[in-house]
Amino acid sequence: LCYTKLDFIYYGRKCGYTMNFEERKKLLAEWKQSHLLRFYEQLNDEEKQILLSQIDGIDWSFEQAFSHESKSKDSLIEEIDALQLEKILADQEHYRSVGLQAIRDGKLCLLLLAGGQGTRLGFDKPKGCFNVGLTKELYIFQLLIEHIMDVVRAADAYIPLYIMTSNINYQDTITFFEAHDYFGYDASYVHFFIQEMNPATDFGGKILLKSKYEVALSPNGNGGWFSSMHKAGLLDAIFDSNLEWINVFAVDNVLQRIADPVFLGATIASGKMSGAKVVKKAFPEEKVGVMCKENGKPHIIEYYEMTDEMLTKRTADGNLAYGFGAILNYLFPISRLKETLDESMPLHVVKKKVPYVDESGNPVTPSEPNAFKFETLALDLIHKMDDCLIFEVDREKEFAPIKNSTGVDSVETARELLIKNGYTL
């Protein structure tokens, strides 16, 4: 067996071993990150402990994103078949029956990805706390819970709901739910946890300091939620239960159907390992990740990775061959997810603006991207599945994302769709 430096670090953490100061200095020197202790002697005892604790918690796997150059691999990209609306509508009562029974039998739990802030909406709170109402209060979190409650009433059974926050909005999110009595949901079924963080680095790979005693950390992307649940100590209870499926969804689509018994029932009936809700692309160049197959396995290809030929290719019936956009609403089998805990996830490097302190300890707020962030993506989790039911939904009824304050995918467009679907705002 060949063990790496990372293996020994993670084994030590698993055994509860805490490094002393000299061991930390040696570790940082080996990773060429000794500058993290630059201001150590200027700190008080509490600040020293915060810094050392953050250093102990660094996931050093981000270094592999630098050491492994991106290399072209032989990939066969093919279109993927979907269960389309016409077929779903014809069999929906059967699918609904199968799905509701699975929910009654305690086979389904839910995961809400709610780490985002409402910054792009001009709102300095968790995005889920944003009020989309015009004449009354109607919050994003409220709408999502109401969608789940529709299923709870139909199944006569509550569904465990896990809510992943960031370290920034964790307490604000809990306080908001408590202040609104969980919008009628049984609080004993709701579990909050914090998304894991990765350090941000400058373009030379040096980890940035947010302050003299804080590492610059950022959320690890939308693909790392299962390891974050593991770190939060939530998985033992899940593994010991009857739960078989987890429905993962994002906070910003206010029309989506969550715990959808038709989606669940169709996925179970198909015999496929996983499921993904999709919408038909509005036009070939729409900026949305598209479901396809890569080397025979389910995959999401980003719009900017598609060739002109792929963008415009059509099937015999005239539809786009690569025409189903993923909307971040998935069904994953817990048994397969358990196996992924022992498997690595690719890290994607993105350029972002990250505030930091310079060598003199002065705070700097950059006006241009100055740093790398390292993220795992849900599309890589999809690719770990043997197969996937591509489940089409009506975008006018289930796709109203809120990403901007105005324009495309905005509060304005979401309000229009809510009104169109009978909501009083």
Each language-model region and where it sits:
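Structural beta-sheet core signal
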Residues: 110-112, 163, 192, 248, ...
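Short, Lys/Arg-enriched N-terminal segments with co-localized hydrophobic residues
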Residues: 1-18
